[in-house]
Swiss-Prot record:
Keywords: Acyltransferase, Lipoyl, Transferase. Binds 1 lipoyl cofactor covalently. Its cofactor is (R)-lipoate. SUPFAM superfamilies: CoA-dependent acyltransferases, Peripheral subunit-binding domain of 2-oxo acid dehydrogenase complex, Single hybrid motif. One of its GO terms (molecular function) is dihydrolipoyllysine-residue acetyltransferase activity. GO terms for cellular component: pyruvate dehydrogenase complex. Its EC number is 2.3.1.12. NCBIfam families: PDHac_trf_mito (TIGR01349). Coiled coil: none annotated. It is an enzyme of class 2 (transferase). It holds the Pfam family E3_binding. This is Dihydrolipoyllysine-residue acetyltransferase component of pyruvate dehydrogenase complex. The lineage of its organism: Bacteria, Pseudomonadati, Pseudomonadota, Alphaproteobacteria, Rickettsiales.
Length: 412
């Protein structure tokens, strides 16, 4: 009897996904545990393993298909000797989804519009000189200060077309071509990750009452301790500590002291998290993901750094599992490496807080009534006022500042 292969549910919020690639073809033998396809979810590309043994009799949904509903039929396994008519009847009975191939065939293409203009426009007669030119060629000639009389047309009946203008070489230095790309834009279809980011962030800005608190942190002591640790492990690059590792640990320790900031909004109740699980924003080629450092308050700086390096690598390779990016009680977004001084990040619902971290820079400060130089880092907390009151947010930032400016406290 034929066996269904269904579009898997890879996360609690997943309702549809993109079937990125088939790793088996029709007629191939399939064994339990073999990877047969790759599914693109809102956060990563996941591998699909076969559960049953059989022959891949029919691929119902081709690769590069978008928006395939979960639990819909994507392929059929058969046993040896089953007839094709039985397979076709089985598919007709169980299939209720039409594939939506990932294609830009229906998107308007600017160069096609240009071609149509050149092919369909009527030939225009210019006074007694009888110069024939397409409207596009005339526009380009005007932009480049080119006299049409000096251009030889290569189109039908000597008609001047776009390419004649673009390839024209002036006879004097006074005639100069200004080449402009006639295609004003290019269209890139939104992938699943970009659609989810757009949906969730729009929902956040429209429904979550954000408020923002900022604070400056002196990171001179932190930079000194970081240098000492990295010198101690100079031969082992996997143990090199980043400033962001210290920031994650400082947030974890601050949340341990201020558990009211480690919370999520619900219509009927606020959820206060017993575990300190911190989401860290990581930029990838197709958008943004937030892998989670779980129980961050229980890890030392070396353990946390190694785990974060592994999560970043998996994120950039699209290899994160759902357990590694779903959940979390607090998010960190660090744009300091781009030279950004400060910014207001958008909360990731249902979380109630996200902290934006800016670049560290030397500034003049007053200490003991004396002007001195210190390395200062700006951080801004975005908080959901339904969950976190202003005083709680301020107390959290004060605790974070304490750990950053006295890093030995979080290494004990």
């Amino acid at each position: 009897m034929p066996i269904k292969i269904l579009m898997p549910v890879l996360s609690p919020t997943m309702t549809e996904g993109n079937l990125a690639r088939w790793l088996k073809k029709e007629g191939d033998k399939v064994n339990p545990g073999e990877v047969i396809a790759e599914i693109e979810t809102d956060k990563a590309t996941m591998e699909v393993e076969a559960v049953d043994e059989g022959i891949l009799a029919k691929i119902v949904i081709p690769q590069n298909s978008q928006n395939v509903p979960v639990n819909s039929l994507i392929a059929v396994l058969s046993e040896e000797g089953e007839e094709k008519t039985d397979i076709d009847a089985f598919i007709a009975k169980n299939n209720n989804v039409s594939p939506s191939p990932k294609t830009d065939a229906n998107l308007p293409k600017p160069h096609e519009n240009i071609a149509k203009v050149e092919e369909q426009v009527a030939v225009i007669k210019h006074d007694a000189s009888k110069i024939f030119a397409s409207p596009l060629a005339k526009r380009l000639a005007k932009m480049g200060n080119i006299r049409l009389e000096s251009v030889k047309g290569s189109g039908p009946h000597g008609r001047i077309v776009k390419q004649d203008i673009l390839s024209y070489t002036p006879s004097t230095v006074h005639n100069k071509i200004v080449s402009r790309n006639p295609e004003e834009y290019r269209l890139v279809p939104n992938n699943n990750i970009r659609k989810i980011i757009a949906k969730r962030l729009l929902e956040s800005k429209q429904t979550v009452p954000h408020f923002y608190l900022s604070i400056e942190c002196n990171v001179d002591k932190l930079l000194d301790i970081r240098e000492d640790i990295n010198k101690s492990f100079s031969e082992d690059k996997s143990t090199r500590i980043s400033v962001n590792d210290f920031i994650i640990l400082a947030v974890a320790k601050a949340l341990q002291e201020l558990p009211n900031a480690n919370a999520s909004w619900g219509e009927d109740a606020i959820r206060y998290h017993n575990n300190v699980d911190i989401s860290v924003a990581v930029a990838i080629e197709n958008g943004l993901v937030t892998p989670i450092v779980k129980n961050a308050n229980q890890k030392n700086i070396i353990e946390l750094s190694r785990e974060m390096k592994e999560l970043i690598k998996k994120a950039k390779d699209n290899k994160l599992t759902p357990e590694e990016f779903q959940g979390g009680g607090f998010t960190i977004s660090n744009l300091g490496m781009y030279g950004i001084k400060n910014f207001n990040a958008i909360i990731n619902p249902p979380q109630s807080c996200i902290m934006g971290v800016g670049a560290s820079a030397k500034r003049a400060i007053v200490k003991n009534d004396q002007v001195t130089i210190a390395t200062i880092m700006d951080v801004t907390l975005s908080a959901d006022h339904r969950v976190v009151d202003g005083a709680v947010g301020a107390e959290f930032l004060a605790a974070f500042k304490k750990f950053i400016e006295s890093p030995a406290l979080m290494l004990i």
